[in-house]
């Protein structure tokens, strides 16, 4: 398999969605990888799966589904898709240091508390841990109650949207008035030109 960046290793190169328990990384006979959802869509239109990159054919016997294709072990080692019976994964994107997905075990009986050491990023000797940091309540916009500043900003945002809509309407009306005025001038000039050639009797 060609060298890929960590981003492209973690996402299907057809639909650009991250691999997950629903979109498992499936390995084709040609050693290219794409998600099970994309492969299933390709399979519905043809009997065999044709690789979108090298056009290599992966033969699937009758009654054999895409989900029975092998998972790509390299991708699984990085993303560590858990079995759904073990725990519910939480995926955190950390762009500052290149770590993109971090499955944390969440127990229904016990929540992850500040200071708890959480989990795995890479297998084997490359395991890393995460210290959960407490964020002050006023800086937690995703909590059930929105911070007071966000509540105060909401009417301001609506006001900005209304004022920008109103200014757009006013601009259209102003342009229409200018066009009508110019049309009036042109029509007036045309009527004056036709009057120059009328015969005036002197009698």
Swiss-Prot record:
Compartment(s) of residence: Lysosome membrane
Signal peptide: none
Chief localisation class: membrane
Biological processes, Gene Ontology terms: apoptotic process; cellular response to amino acid starvation; negative regulation of TORC1 signaling; positive regulation of autophagy; protein K48-linked ubiquitination; protein K63-linked ubiquitination; protein monoubiquitination
EC numbers on record: 2.3.2.27
Membrane topology: Single-pass membrane protein
Region (Disordered): 140-159
Catalysed reactions, as listed in the record: S-ubiquitinyl-[E2 ubiquitin-conjugating enzyme]-L-cysteine + [acceptor protein]-L-lysine = [E2 ubiquitin-conjugating enzyme]-L-cysteine + N(6)-ubiquitinyl-[acceptor protein]-L-lysine
Keywords recorded for this protein, A-Z: Apoptosis, Lysosome, Membrane, Metal-binding, Transferase, Transmembrane, Transmembrane helix, Ubl conjugation, Ubl conjugation pathway, Zinc, Zinc-finger
Stretches of the chain forming a coiled coil according to its record: none
SMART domains tied to this protein: RING
Top EC class for this record: transferase
Post-translational modification as stated in the protein's UniProt record: Ubiquitinated. Autoubiquitinated in vitro, leading to its degradation by the proteasome.
UniProt-listed InterPro entries: RING_RNF152 (IPR033609), RNF152_C (IPR045744), Znf_RING (IPR001841), Znf_RING/FYVE/PHD (IPR013083)
Transmembrane segments: 167-187
Any one GO molecular function term: small GTPase binding
Similarity comment: Belongs to the RNF152 family.
Biological role: E3 ubiquitin-protein ligase that acts as a negative regulator of mTORC1 signaling by mediating ubiquitination of RagA/RRAGA and RHEB. Catalyzes 'Lys-63'-linked polyubiquitination of RagA/RRAGA in response to amino acid starvation, thereby regulating mTORC1 signaling. Also mediates monoubiquitination of RHEB, promoting its association with the TSC-TBC complex and subsequent inhibition. Also mediates 'Lys-48'-linked polyubiquitination of target proteins and their subsequent targeting to the proteasome for degradation. Induces apoptosis when overexpressed.
Assembly, per entry: Interacts with RRAGA (inactive GDP-bound form); stimulated by amino acid starvation. Interacts with SEC16A.
Name of protein: E3 ubiquitin-protein ligase RNF152
Lineage: Eukaryota, Metazoa, Chordata, Craniata, Vertebrata
């Amino acid at each position: 398999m060609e060298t890929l960046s960590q981003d492209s290793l973690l996402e299907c190169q057809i639909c650009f969605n991250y691999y997950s328990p629903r979109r498992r990384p499936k390995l084709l006979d040609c050693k290219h990888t794409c998600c099970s959802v994309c492969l299933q869509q390709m399979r519905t239109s043809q009997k065999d799966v044709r690789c979108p990159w090298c056009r290599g054919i992966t033969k699937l016997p009758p009654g054999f589904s895409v989900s029975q294709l092998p998972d790509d072990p390299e991708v699984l080692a990085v993303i560590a898709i858990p079995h759904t019976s073990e725990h519910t994964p939480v995926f955190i994107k950390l762009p500052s240091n290149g770590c993109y997905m971090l499955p944390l075990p969440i127990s229904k009986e016990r929540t992850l508390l500040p200071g708890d050491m959480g989990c795995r990023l890479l297998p084997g000797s490359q395991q890393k841990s995460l210290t959960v940091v407490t964020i002050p309540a006023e800086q937690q916009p995703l909590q059930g109650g929105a911070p007071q500043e966000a509540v105060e900003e909401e009417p301001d945002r609506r006001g900005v949207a209304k004022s920008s809509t109103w200014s757009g309407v006013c601009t259209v009306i102003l342009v229409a008035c200018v066009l009508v005025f110019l049309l009036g001038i042109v029509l007036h000039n045309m009527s004056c030109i036709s009057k120059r050639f009328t015969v005036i009797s002197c009698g």
